[in-house]
Regions:
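Rossmann-fold dinucleotide-binding core
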Residues: 176-178
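Hydrophobic core
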Residues: 12-17
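Short, glycine-/small- and polar/acidic-enriched structural segments
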Residues: 24-160, 167-170, 186-190
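Carboxylate- and glycine-rich phosphate/diphosphate-binding segment that chelates Mg2+/Mn2+
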Residues: 182-184
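Sec/Tat signal peptide C-region and signal peptidase I cleavage site
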Residues: 18-23
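Bacterial N-terminal signal peptides that target proteins for export
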Residues: 1-8
Length: 190
């Protein structure tokens, strides 16, 4: 894990060379993150004091969905974003207003980063595997999110059309989880 923290630290140090706010030789930076395991290297670096040891004063700003992190990075609300490759991120990077400087996580075969969940009622009615998502109401954070993209990959893999799924964008992970628990959707990608 320390290696990932070093990667995050290296990115911050590269950014420091470009003219960042300094106070008493401490570099200040705001990092936009989600409350997900994919941001764990940043959480560990913060909790273990790795940033502080390197002369960095890091403030974490939490977001409810990935796409707003890319927007906040380009607007200057945060200095860095730890986020998924969303449609919005690709758009901003394609316009040259956002740069990808490193990657922190990747899926390993058999260990997906995204969970596929069925509501209790949908499960009891037969929603047992991703191939059963066709015809169901499926919560994602946002249209164009990494969860939306993953749903498209599931459709390709299991032989149904994405248009066969009623996509329900709920703007945050907590809203998607609440909809799943409240049975207002059949499934959610979280």
């Amino acid at each position: 894990m320390k290696g990932w923290a070093r990667l995050a630290l290296a990115g911050l140090l590269m950014w420091a060379a470009s003219g960042i706010a300094r106070a008493d030789d401490v570099l200040k930076a705001k990092i936009g993150v989600l409350r997900l395991s994919s941001s764990a290297p940043v959480f560990i670096a913060q909790d273990k004091g790795y940033f502080r040891e390197a002369g960095l004063d890091v403030e974490l700003k939490f977001f409810d969905a990935a796409q707003p992190i890319a927007v906040a990075t380009t607007s200057g609300d945060v200095d860095f974003g730890v986020t998924a490759f969303t449609a919005g991120l690709y758009n901003l990077a394609g316009k040259g207003v956002l740069k990808v400087i490193g990657g922190m996580s990747r899926e390993k075969a058999g260990y997906p980063l995204i969970g596929y969940f069925a509501s209790n009622n949908a499960y009891a009615a037969g929603l047992k595997t991703p191939k059963d998502l066709a015809g169901k109401r499926v919560a994602v954070t946002q249209v164009g999110s990494s969860f939306h993209y993953s749903l498209g990959l599931l459709a390709d893999k299991y032989g149904f059309k994405l248009s066969d799924v009623k996509i329900v964008p709920l703007q945050s992970l907590s809203n998607a989880a609440a909809a799943l628990k409240g049975e207002t959707v059949d499934a959610a990608l979280l």
